């Protein structure tokens, strides 16, 4: 069925890019949406071309296309990941304000009881941010902050990135060896 991947304008777009690369290498179906600020942040934070990221997905959609298949509950998916998830997008979803394809697809996942994982990338967090996360968590949304572990002695930035990517894959039951798990020697 496939996983929807949304990249928003929060700092840390490389997490989303690494996730889509990983899903592509696993030959899994993906549906990609990048917000306007997600695209701008990719240009600011990386030397990666947007077209490259789009080509990694099975299908990509314009965030303004509210008629895209992923905007309907009748279009079956395995769920959605918003990585990184800006606080604007988080607030939009938490308050049912479906003003673009990303927030609409997330609302569809909630109403259809499909897996929705948000990877917030903000610090510090205000009470409003935390309340929005609690609201989503109470609806069954997985809140997976971009907070990598250090127990496995990461030596590169990729080690830190793949720790989070591996945790996202775990949320969907996708077997992976992206990071060293606690208590497991490699």
Language-model features: locations:
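A cross-family phosphate/adenosyl-ligand binding-site feature
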Residues: 1-117, 123-186
């Amino acid at each position: 069925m496939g996983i929807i991947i949304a990249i928003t304008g929060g700092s840390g777009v490389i997490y989303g890019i690494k996730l889509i690369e990983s899903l592509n290498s696993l030959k899994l179906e993906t549906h990609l949406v990048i917000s306007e600020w997600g695209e701008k942040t990719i240009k600011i934070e990386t030397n990666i071309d947007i077209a490259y990221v789009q080509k990694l997905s099975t299908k990509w959609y314009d965030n303004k296309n509210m008629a895209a298949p992923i905007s309907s509950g009748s279009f079956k998916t395995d769920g959605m990941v918003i990585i990184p998830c800006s606080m604007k997008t988080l607030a939009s979803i938490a308050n049912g304000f479906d003003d673009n394809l990303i927030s609409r697809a997330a609302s569809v996942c909630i109403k259809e009881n499909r897996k929705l994982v948000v990877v917030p990338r903000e610090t510090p967090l205000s009470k409003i941010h935390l309340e929005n996360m609690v609201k989503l968590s109470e609806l069954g949304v997985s809140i997976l902050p971009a907070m990598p572990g250090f127990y496995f002695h990461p030596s590169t930035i990729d080690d830190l990135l793949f720790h989070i990517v591996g945790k996202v894959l775990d949320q969907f039951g996708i077997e992976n060896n992206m990071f060293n798990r606690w208590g497991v020697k490699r």
